[in-house]
Amino acid sequence: MKIETINILKRTDQLSETEKNNIYLLKASHWSYEIKSQIEWFKKNIISSDLHNMLIIDNNLVGYTALRKKKCRLKLKKLISNEKILIFDTYIIKDEFRKKGFGTKLIKSNNKVIRDTNLMSFLLCDENMINFYKKNGWKFLKSDQFQLINHKYNSNGMIFNFEKDNT
């Protein structure tokens, strides 16, 4: 049986209500926040030009990432970037689709989007995700190598599409 997979990339202002609801449901199933909290967070934090990469398998949303276009102050050792960057905000693959290559497919799609925008991208991640991001072209930043200004975090940093050797 062949599995039909589709990657759909849309800006927030292109998402249908059904697509938004599917995103809320997927996020609520992954994190311990109710759908109502997901909706409120989405409305408060997501802007119309943010990018949503959805992995659809047999008409079901099984993977999702958000790339948020933000002007961000990111301090990398000596360099402070005060430019628009893509914050890689969310990465979810449903449990039953993990370790089957679908996550890699989704991240590679994201990497292409990031390269095509010619912007740098930054993410915060848990320890258990570092090797996954590294094998997909992201560079690990130790906590003393970066400072995300005006943001509370307690995670590892990863950076993509940053060619200068300032880190």
What are these regions (language model features)?
Residues 1-43, 47, 51-54, 61, ...:
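Short amphipathic alpha-helix that is part of the acyltransferase structural core
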Residues 1-5, 9-13, 124-167:
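Terminal substrate-recognition subdomain of acyl/acetyltransferases
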Residues 51-53, 84-86, 154-158:
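Short beta-strand micro-motifs in enzyme catalytic cores
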Residues 54, 60-78, 85-92:
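Conserved beta-strand in the GNAT
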Residues 70-72, 96, 128:
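Short coil/turn motifs at secondary-structure junctions
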Residues 93, 99-112:
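Conserved acetyl-CoA-binding loop-helix of GNAT-fold acetyltransferases
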Residues 112-126:
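Conserved GNAT acetyl-CoA-binding A-motif
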